[in-house]
Regions:
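Anionic-ligand-binding alpha/beta catalytic cores of soluble enzymes and soluble regulatory domains
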Residues: 128-209
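N-terminal glycine-rich anion-binding loop in soluble enzyme alpha/beta folds
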Residues: 2-6, 10-51
């Protein structure tokens, strides 16, 4: 039997945008990529990030990137600042490469992976000949991603000027901070079911289901959630919110057979405090 040889595998580009699929923008980006690197395997993470919602896009990327092969190139476009002074960047972090705007979209990557190199995409050789002020996904990010998938580390240094990763934009919403046993964080994503995803990694609270009492408090809304469930079917009280560990690896809040965002009246950006205490 022929054994799989990962060194002979096709290059992989993963796309994530807020473009939707009603227009031709996603198809055009794929066409640009295929024109440069015809053998590339293009995988869509999603094209339905809420429009201009950088925090949601950052979280979706964070929940997905670990499940792709090493050396995958992520081309990510949630870019409300396109055409402005915001920087176009590529970074080599962990075992993967990321291409997109410097607007906080890579906040979780920067927090979770060692950054090996970062470049400003200043070399026009790797762009399309004519760069629009409104479609950098087509004119800069797609061609850069395609060239990068062909050459990876060899090409990376040629993409532009090296920049200090400490200068990259990071979303405050993606940060967590401890105060004793309390954790201050935010809601960073609302999924299709209305579940509220927090910026707190589940492994940050190993006692989530063993501590005598755990609460998530929304101080601005005066809302407290303290029921905990290991899985959705265990949440037998329809209409009541409970805390759970989401499959993405982050702590979430759900309502069985309901919508937590609507039930609690909160959404992306809401401040929370997770409190662990003995009764």
């Amino acid at each position: 039997m022929t054994q799989y040889d990962p060194t002979n595998s096709r290059p992989v580009i993963a796309l994530m945008t807020d473009f939707g699929i009603g227009d031709g923008d996603v198809g055009v980006m794929k066409g640009v990529i295929a024109s440069i690197t015809p053998d590339v395997h293009i995988i869509d993470i999603t094209h339905h990030v809420a429009p201009q919602n950088v925090p949601s896009g950052a979280w979706i990327l964070a929940s997905a990137y670990r499940y792709f092969p090493k050396n995958t190139v992520y081309v990510c476009v949630v870019d409300p600042g396109v055409g402005s002074s915001r920087r176009a960047i590529a970074l080599h972090a962990g075992d993967w490469f990321f291409v997109g705007p410097d607007n906080g979209l890579f906040s979780y990557i920067l927090a979770e992976q060692p950054v090996r190199a970062t470049v400003l995409l200043s070399n026009p050789t790797y762009h399309l000949p004519h760069v629009s002020s409104t479609f950098h996904g087509r004119d800069i990010f797609a061609p850069v991603g395609a060239h990068l998938a062909r050459g990876l580390t060899r090409t990376f240094a040629e993409l532009g000027t090296s920049i200090d990763p400490a200068t990259l934009q990071r979303l405050e919403i993606a940060l967590t901070s401890r105060r004793g046993t309390d954790i201050d964080a935010h809601i960073v994503h609302v999924d299709n079911f209305g579940n509220l995803i927090t910026s707190i990694p589940s492994d940050m609270v190993p006692e989530l289901f063993t501590a005598p009492q755990v609460q998530i408090i929304f101080p601005q809304q005066g809302v407290v959630v303290e029921k905990r469930r290991r899985f959705f079917a265990e949440g037998h009280e329809d209409g009541q919110a409970f805390i759970y560990s989401d499959s993405s690896g982050y702590i979430g809040i759900a309502v069985r057979n309901g919508n937590a965002a609507r039930t609690l009246g909160v959404g992306v950006g809401a401040a929370i405090t997770l409190v662990t205490a003995a009764k």
